[in-house]
Amino acid sequence: MNSTPRSFFYFLFTGSYAIFLLTFLLLPSDSLPEHKILSADKLWHMLSYFLLALGLMFSFREGGWKRWYNRRWSLIISLGHAGFSEVLQEFVPGRSASIDDWIANCIGIGLALLGLNLFPKFFEKSSSP
């Protein structure tokens, strides 16, 4: 691992995004969105967790981590965040835990990881300065 100021910035930015996302998902709500398969709510869940996983992958890349390590920890952290946020929503007024939301989160994470596999050179740090 090669820790650089740029790597620190990426992790700081991604960590801040994760905290913002958790805070936003735990705000009390007056009404619950409808549970449709392709509703705007599900698309927002997918996009939010796609961005979280993507941020983690770039953070690990800037730290000089290998692709297998990048993939593994991006998946573990993203899935942990998604599951934790859904469980906590059960205790927030106007919110509820939803397996549909968690599946949408997982799809977003999966799409980011698919991008890592389809475009590996994009996610690997070049050896030139």
Regions found by a protein language model. Give the residues of each.
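Bulky hydrophobic segments
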Residues: 1-102, 106-129
